[in-house]
A protein has these predicted regions:
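Membrane-proximal, proline-rich intrinsically disordered regions
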Residues: 23-81, 318, 327, 350, ...
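Extended ligand-binding clefts on enzyme/binding-domain cores
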Residues: 58-62, 201, 207-211, 257-258, ...
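Conserved, well-structured interaction surfaces
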Residues: 94-172, 207, 220, 224-228, ...
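Inward-facing hydrophobic residues that define packing positions of alpha-helical scaffold repeats
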Residues: 51, 125-128, 213, 220, ...
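Short, surface-exposed recognition loops and adjoining beta-strand edges that mediate ligand/DNA contacts
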Residues: 38, 65-84, 89, 171-188, ...
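Bacterial Sec-dependent N-terminal signal peptides
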Residues: 2-7, 13-14, 18-45, 216, ...
């Protein structure tokens, strides 16, 4: 389906969605295809193609370096969300100019990375809304049944919620700041199909963070009710939204709200309430893989991955966006752009012999960047490494944190150990709960999810907590690592972080809205400190 108009008005990043085909074919084996307005929702087969187009927007998207649209760089979820999430934190180190602005916090309202993230997230949201309207109309025309429509809608609602939450994380203050009373983002639920829709949409102001979270939960609740527990095969059950994916994402969203009762309630649905031992979800059959490599080496067929964004050889973020290209070492034909911080790698809580250190990190001993690199994404030749959005280990650690805050240390410890003990030597396993169980859970998250883009989410939600950093932490600079090389990566070594921290009160803790949006939409209020 093509949207056949172009708007001169910037509507919350929807210029991309308004000017491009909104239905694309994106399957594991097929390239992009276009569908006309008249046929997009005229058959079940075409509806499937239209839905694949929504996933294509999530996985590949478009990119505008300031000179016009180009092929995608994996915005928003085909790599960019992971890369930006890591570069906003301190556990991975930017080595070259590619991510320097994000890493050092010098972004402005016209910086390409944050502008494109905003625009492509809203492009995804609009395509989800267009799809929802299309399948609702298809019921009235007798093309599909109401149950079939609901199942399709569930996938679009999941992606809409995921996209809005990503926007809130980067462009808004955390929920913990005055219980979400700060400026949120416009929560778009109506398809932008023509100029009247654009005019109506412009009238919508930002609202509050709390309002956004309420709508995210509403979308996920509906998605849970509509979606099946599994798809026709395992690859589709991982790469398409399912009931388990909606529940799992709710554990994350509720954790950002510090709504621990609901984190636990959702975690229980996925089997996080048994006493100890091997946890298995009654929905989807999720469980931890015995080998920490399996979710990454068998990305389309494992029991731990709940939802990932699929990439193919034909359609991916390219050399400038695909996660394998951006995170890998030159020894594997990667670009040496991002190294693991020695201050994480050497931390006493990341013990020697941990399989996530020996199997999922690579020590590069040659070339100009003798450092440690992430080794989760290995499909560098064809760039089809899938991007993990949520794994079962996150559900367990989300629920562990909630139990710890509710005073059930026994269950929190059991969940923590389930994730940790599969990776560390038996001699390094906890026999009794650490004196600060919450801290141990936070440290475990840094190890388990390094290279998966979750560091920023934790820094954001915990900014005002005693366990947080009260802003963006100080960071190690590339020059410090190139000087010392692998001597930096030794037990006990702490490299002084010379890039100054950004206090929570500084405007740069959150990104500015794109200047093009604020200038074109008088109702869209810019974040404080960035002007209008």
């Amino acid at each position: 389906m093509k949207l056949k108009y172009k708007s001169k008005l910037a509507l919350a990043g929807l210029l991309m969605a308004l000017a491009m085909p909104s239905c694309k074919k994106f399957t594991e084996l097929s390239p992009l295809d276009k569908l006309s307005d008249n046929t997009a929702f005229s058959s079940k087969q075409n509806i499937e193609l239209a839905l694949n187009g929504v996933y294509w927007q999530a996985a590949v998207g478009r990119y505008n370096p300031g000179t016009g649209l180009t092929t995608g760089r994996g915005y928003p979820f085909g790599g960019a969300s992971i890369e930006q999430g890591e570069m906003r934190g301190e556990d991975m180190v930017n080595l070259q100019a590619f991510y320097q602005i994000t890493y050092e916090g010098t972004y402005t309202a016209t910086t390409a990375n944050n502008v494109n993230h905003w625009e492509q997230l809203y492009a995804l949201i609009n395509q989800a809304n267009v799809f929802i309207k299309g399948v609702e109309d298809a019921v009235g025309k007798g093309v599909i049944t109401q149950d079939e429509s609901n199942a399709y809608k569930g996938e679009a609602l999941f992606l809409r919620a995921l996209a809005h939450h990503e926007l809130v994380l980067h462009f808004c203050k955390p929920y913990a700041d005055n219980k979400g009373s700060n400026l949120g983002v416009p929560y778009r639920t109506k398809a932008m199909m023509g100029a009247p829709d654009v005019e109506e949409g412009i009238s919508q102001k930002r609202g509050t963070v709390a309002e956004d979270y309420a709508k995210i939960i509403e979308d996920l609740n509906n998605a849970e009710n509509y979606l099946p527990a599994a798809k026709a095969d395992k690859a589709l059950s991982i790469s398409k939204a399912t009931k388990g994916a909606a529940i799992a994402l709710k554990t994350r969203v509720y954790l950002h709200m510090a709504d621990y009762d609901n984190v636990i309630a959702e975690g229980k649905k996925l089997g996080a309430d048994v006493g100890s031992g091997a946890f298995t979800s009654p929905i989807g059959g999720y469980k931890l893989e015995a080998d920490v490599e399996t979710p990454f080496t068998s990305q389309a067929n494992n029991l731990e991955s709940i939802f990932s964004i699929a990439q193919t050889q034909a359609q991916n973020g390219g050399v400038n966006g695909a996660i394998a290209s951006m995170f890998s070492a030159s020894a594997f034909k990667g670009r040496d752009l991002i190294a693991t911080s020695p201050n994480l790698y050497n931390a006493d809580f990341w013990v020697e012999g941990d399989a996530r250190k020996t199997k999922l990190q690579y020590i590069q001993t040659t070339g100009n960047y003798k450092m440690v690199f992430n080794y989760k994404y290995r499909a560098i030749a064809v760039l089809d490494s899938w991007n993990p959005i949520i794994r079962y280990s996150e559900v367990l650690l989300n629920t562990a944190e909630a139990y710890a805050y509710k005073g059930n240390n026994t269950q929190a410890f059991a969940l923590l150990n389930a994730v940790r003990n599969r990776a560390v030597p038996s001699s390094k396993q906890f026999m009794v709960a650490p004196s600060d169980l919450k801290l141990a859970i936070y440290q475990e998250r840094r190890i388990e999810f390094t290279g998966e883009g979750k560091r920023w989410g934790d820094l954001h939600r915990l900014a005002l907590s005693s366990y947080g950093k009260n802003g963006v932490p100080a960071k190690v600079l590339s020059a410090q690592l190139t000087t010392g090389g692998l001597d930096n990566y030794k037990p006990g070594v702490v490299v002084e972080a010379k890039r100054a921290a950004i206090p929570y009160t500084d405007k740069s803790f959150i990104w500015p809205l794109p200047q093009s949006e604020v200038s074109s939409n008088p109702n869209l209020e810019q974040n404080p400190g960035y002007g209008n």
